């Protein structure tokens, strides 16, 4: 389980990212979420979420939300299981082999970062940056298919430096 505050900040970060990026895929996700808000309570929540994300749908706002989400995830963690496992194993690197946008690895990546263990992930497809939402949390290293994806990653995420991104060609990770 994770902190409700961390989850709320992560949702707002993802929503603000989509609104800032405003790709066709982001517009479609926005439309689908509007459609899913099919009760008065859900509609009100959706309106509040959209209204609060709009002022943050810019690079400075996204950076602020990233810092807040990181602090909330790190300081309000409800379990030390990942951190304890990493202390026992003492890995040189924590690699997220699941989808980069999957929330399955979020707590483990935050725990690794808190312990100073480098993190890495792979972008599985050319459209992951524009159709799947925000990468949360940010990693220390990224493996990408080609130079175009590398450049797009660096453009969308100004906090990522070029030396953190490695072009590996298309890969299948088992």
Set out the residue ranges of the language-model regions.
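Structural motif
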Residues: 1, 97-100, 124, 145-147
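A nucleotide-sugar donor-handling region in carbohydrate enzymes
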Residues: 73-75, 137-174
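Membrane-proximal helix-turn-helix segments that form the acceptor-binding/catalytic region
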Residues: 83-84, 110, 129-141
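Short N-terminal targeting/anchoring amphipathic segment
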Residues: 83-102
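A short helix->loop->beta-strand "cap" motif at the edges of active sites that frequently abuts
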Residues: 91-92, 115-118, 139, 160-163
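Short acidic loop-to-helix transition motifs that present clustered carboxylates
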Residues: 124-130, 172-173
